[in-house]
Amino acid sequence: MMKFIALFALVAVASAGKMTFKDCGHGEVTELDITGCSGDTCVIHRGEKMTLEAKFAANQDTAKVTIKVLAKVAGTTIQVPGLETDGCKFIKCPVKKGEALDFIYSGTIPAITPKVKADVTAELIGDHGVMACGTVHGQVE
């Protein structure tokens, strides 16, 4: 029993500060960091600034990149409105296949955003389909 507790504590410490995410593409996303988030659920606060940083390898040559953010709430998936969709404002375009990219997106969570729990999926879409995709469990407070 003590060995299990020690192993659990070691895993918890090793995971501290790391955001748990699911790569919903083909393994392009190597790292995801959201300001103030760690563990299995990312809690963001209305009216506060947040920064998302994703490191990924481009899986295609593309002249443009489009950002698409989806939220799954109570079994229904909706596209999140009001967010910037031009990915070239956050990474240098054109993009070359195999290029290591660091995507940084900053913004303020609108104060009128309802308190909700959702699975949030962000996709970066190039000329030939999805370039990178990640899903996190999120909660707005």
Curated annotation (Swiss-Prot):
Residue ranges of sequence repeats: 64-65, 68-69, 72-73
Q: Note whether Secreted occurs among the keywords.
A: yes
GO CC terms in record: extracellular region
What is one Gene Ontology biological process annotated in the Swiss-Prot or TrEMBL record? sterol transport
Region labeled 3 X 2 AA repeats of K-V — which residues? 64-73
The chain's disulfide connectivity reads 24-133, 37-42, 88-93
Which superkingdom, per the lineage? Eukaryota
Q: Where in the cell is it found?
A: Secreted
Signal peptide range = 1-16
Its main localization is secreted
GO molecular function terms listed in the Swiss-Prot or TrEMBL record: sterol binding
The record's listing under SUPFAM superfamilies reads: E set domains
- Subunit field text: Monomer.
Q: Which family does the UniProt entry place this protein in?
A: Belongs to the NPC2 family.
PANTHER family in UniProt: NIEMANN PICK TYPE C2 PROTEIN NPC2-RELATED, NPC INTRACELLULAR CHOLESTEROL TRANSPORTER 2
The name of this protein is: Mite group 2 allergen Lep d 2
Source organism: Lepidoglyphus destructor
